[in-house]
Amino acid sequence: MAAGKDRSPCARCAEALGRSCCQPGPGERLATLTATDVERIRAATGWRRERFVEHEPLASEEALAYEARRPGYRGYFRTTTVRWGLRAERGACVFLVGHGCTLPPGTRPTACLLYPFEPTDHGWTLAVERSGSVELAARSGEPRCLAAEEARSRGGLLRSFALDVEGLTALIDRLRAEVKAHPQPLDSVKPRAARFVGEAAERDASPRSRRARLR
């Protein structure tokens, strides 16, 4: 569907709120990718990985904090502390044209299909806060979601993305399966000399480390 004719919340978000989730602000990052996402997009577009994948090295402590904050990505950093994300150019995702994504829905990253929903240990929550009105959201300067502002119930919010609870649960299960299979080596990623998350966790769990923290 042409972006000009699509009046879904996603198509109207940038116009109503000033920017969309595909247009990161200062210090913000686009969707986290799994190796499965990368291969699916590469196969569909023919693009080289470097054209749409950004590699963000994290310290071990940052990687541990990321997984603690986002349970859906638990295990993502088990072999490396490099986060793979969608690349932004000129303030927007490389796949954003006008108000729409050029990737077919079946090709898009699982994180994009899930947004604004965030997996938790016991279900899901919203990844963004609600301001209470579209006008307040537009003035906040913070990441917001037009669908979340317009929805009057959780069910209504799900329906605005053509989802129900079962469909959302299936997407969450898909994300967890892809995280479990991540990462597969990318040609452009070189092994880091930094500590692995697993090594940091083992070190923190050692009696010597526990004694040091008590001092």
Each predicted region: which residue ranges?
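Short loop/turn segments that flank or connect secondary-structure elements
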Residues: 1-215
